[in-house]
C-alpha cells in the first residue's frame, strides 16, 4: 500500500466544538474525510490559532500521521519494504549488523522527538514564507525523518553512554535506510530527500527543506531528555546550534528563523 492510499484513514468522527478545539499540535484526534470540511470551518471559527497551528492542523487532517505511522510500524510492513529494497540489508551487512526490525525503536520517539520536530519544522517553514505545498512536504518529511531507526539495534540507539566509532557509523545509516525503505511506498521525492538528507551538513546540500528539518531535528534532540543526556534549555540549545552554524553544519538563515520562532511561539521554547 502506498502513502497516498492511507491518507485520511480514521474511524473517529471529530465534530463536537470541544473536541475540535483540542486539535492543537497533538497526534491523537483527527477527522475522517466526511467531516474534514466542517471541522476546518468549526476550528477556524471557534479557536483562535496562529499560522503555525493552522498549517499543522491541515497537515494532520490531510495525512493523518497516526494512520501513516501505524500502517508502516509493523514487522509485516517493514519486511515487505526490505524485500523491495534489498540495498538496506547490504548497508547493514557492511556494518556487521543483521537486518532485524526493531519496532520499539520508533515507538519510543514517536510522540516526543518526532512530534516536536514536526512542530518546529512547520513553524520554521511558516516563518520563512514557504509555499503551502512545501510546508506539507516538510511536515511529512519530518514525521518520517527517523524512520530508518527501525533497523538500528536497540542497544546502540538507546545506549546509556557514548557510542563507539563503530556504533556511531551504524546509527548514522538510519537516514539512508529510512530513505530506501520509504522509497518503496510512493512517498514524494521531496519528502524522501528530507529523510535522506536531514543529517547532512548545510554546506553539503542546497535542499532548503532538508536544511529546515535538520535545524528542527537538532533543536528537538537537544531540548528533550534522552537515555544518555538530560533536557537542555532553549538558551543552551541555541548556543550549541549557533556553533553548528559556524562549523557549516546548520544553515544560518534557518537558525535565524528559529530564533524568531522561539520569540513568537512560547510553546516551542524548552
Language model segments and positions:
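Acidic/His-rich, divalent-metal-binding segments that scaffold phosphate/diphosphate chemistry
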Residues: 51-172, 182-185, 190
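Short hydrophobic alpha-helical segments that form membrane-spanning helices or hydrophobic packing faces
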Residues: 256-260
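Non-Sec secretion/translocation targeting segments of pathogen effectors
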Residues: 1-30, 34-35, 39-45, 270
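Alpha-helical scaffolding flanking metal-ion-dependent phosphate/phosphodiester catalytic sites
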Residues: 117, 137-153, 159, 163-255
